[in-house]
Amino acid sequence: MMLVLTTLIFSFSASIAYAQSGCSVSDPLDALKAFKDGAGTFLLQKSTDPQARDCLKGTPNGNRDGNTLPVTMTYKDDSKWVSLNWMFTLEGANIVATLEGKRKQRGELVYDVQSHDCHITKLSSGVYQQWQSNGSADDKDIKCCDEKFKELTSGIDYTKPQEKGCETSAK
């Protein structure tokens, strides 16, 4: 009982500290805006999936058609780069990623900063992911995203896929 009470107090305190930190969020949550309408590459910075792909990044590879966006997901498998073409359907906060019309992965946008340089998704499996725009990103927004990820994943281990020998880029 004491552990539950302590956890509740900690969570409440973290929420107050987060609210007072001056973080501006995108409201309402819109996955298409979080993906910058299909402009630019996003890197998976943090994931609660212990088997998250090393160096995972998503890059739009064609024109957006309404709320559908073709995306190439690239990751490092040992020393070899692998690229797979996915089709993302983005509607409100909902995200459905389909690989070659067969495999589907569902998720939900749970946090997005105002600049759309960083966002957090929660997959239907319960995995949390923090994605960051490749290139110039506002340090304050990234800090806000880091704080929110920490709040959402309190007590859950996570990996940092971009710290797995990603220095050499995929061709």
From Swiss-Prot:
Entry's localization field: Secreted
GO terms of molecular function: toxin activity
Tissue specificity: Expressed in salivary glands.
Entry superkingdom: Eukaryota
Post-translational modification: The N-terminus is blocked.
Keywords: Disulfide bond, Hemostasis impairing toxin, Platelet aggregation inhibiting toxin, Secreted, Signal, Toxin
GO cellular component, one term: extracellular region
InterPro entries in the cross-refs: Calycin
Cystine pairings recorded for this chain: C23-C144, C55-C166, C118-C145
Free-text function comment from the UniProt entry: Tick salivary platelet aggregation inhibitor that plays an important part in the anti-hemostatic strategy of ticks. Acts by scavenging thromboxane A2 (TXA2), a potent inducer of platelet aggregation and blood vessel constriction. As a consequence, is a specific inhibitor of collagen-induced platelet aggregation. In addition, it also acts as a potent inhibitor of TXA2-mediated vasoconstriction. Has also been found to bind leukotriene B4 (LTB4) (which also derives from arachidonic acid, as TXA2) with affinities in the nanomolar range. It does not interact with complement protein C5.
Family statement: Belongs to the calycin superfamily. Lipocalin family.
Protein name: Moubatin
Taxonomic lineage from the root: Eukaryota, Metazoa, Ecdysozoa, Arthropoda, Chelicerata
